[in-house]
Amino acid sequence: MPQLSTTTRVRHAASEMFDLVADVERYPEFVPLCQSLDVRQRSTDGGKHVIVADMTVAYKLIRQTFTSRVTLDRAKLEILVEYLEGPFRSLNNHWTFRPVDEHACDVDFFISYEFRSRALGLLMGAMFDAAFRRFAGAFEGRADQVYGTRAA
């Protein structure tokens, strides 16, 4: 099962990065391969906000839509993404934002996935790997656009 785990230090507050990643409806504007995202449901569970959303990813002529539950834990600065339905056998994704100081944080990103179809995995696997490796940079770039850049 392919997986990727990265830690990136960014020049933005942990709360800012949490808010940016939590704003799933903006993903089509900057997340690699994300063509659309539709929120199905919003709720609160034990002080955590929960979003159920459909994300459509597209690459050339291939389009796949999958549904995930996104749990936003602002108190812990953690975001958990749980796969519900779509072309994957499994998909697990989580983010943790660890403050370094008031203007910087470490962003921990983890994702593992396995396509249900071997053929789809062969067709899209390498492209997904490349896209996921660009995720941290895409979010950092978006943070620079939204919050401005800060000197190191």
What are these regions (language model features)?
Residues 3-5, 63-67, 90-93:
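Short, surface-exposed coil-to-beta transition loops
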Residues 25, 132, 136, 140-147:
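Short amphipathic alpha-helical signal-transduction/dimerization elements
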Residues 80-134:
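Beta-strand/loop substructures that line and gate deep hydrophobic ligand-binding cavities in soluble
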